[in-house]
Amino acid sequence: MAVLISPMIVPLIISGVAIFFFMAKAGLAATHTGIVLAHIILGTPFVVITVTATLSGFDHSVTRAAASLGSNPVNTFMKITLPLILPGVISGGLFAFVTSFDEVVVVLFLAGLENTTIPIQMWTGLREQLSLSLIHI
């Protein structure tokens, strides 16, 4: 569990440098795949924490009752378990999305000249010309 939430604990610049060196060794620096993997690494702690908290409060007697009434495991998961844990999964996904959208440091390390994401474009706009349109985003 500590390994999964370590990107949340370690300072962002250290995570960015570590992810860059790892992606460079793997040949994924300055690629879309490398950027996506970096966002997955940085968003995973938020999903793990919210889904773990949701599952800790989950009542397993409901799934046992469904199994005792003859429901197969796939049907039990789709009709009972998933609707009950869906708020935690959605909130974890939203946290991961907001973190990914806000992430500039790691993407500045990983993105080459041809890769432009929205945070990099916003950073470039702030650096080159101060525009009030960036405040609205």
Report each predicted region and the residues it spans.
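Transmembrane-helix boundary motif in ABC transporter permease subunits
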Residues: 1-4, 17, 21-25, 60-63, ...
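The feature captures the transmembrane alpha-helix scaffold of multi-pass secondary transporters
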Residues: 2, 32-36, 77, 89
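Hydrophobic/aromatic residues in alpha-helical transmembrane segments
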Residues: 2, 15-19, 47, 93-94, ...
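Short hydrophobic faces within alpha-helices
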Residues: 6, 61-69, 122, 134
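Membrane-interfacial helix termini and adjacent extracytoplasmic/periplasmic loops
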Residues: 9-42, 74, 110-114
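A structural signal for multi-pass alpha-helical bundles of membrane permease subunits
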Residues: 15-26, 50, 94-100, 111, ...
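Transmembrane alpha-helices
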Residues: 40-41, 47-60, 72-102
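Interhelical loop and adjacent transmembrane-helix boundary motif
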Residues: 101-136
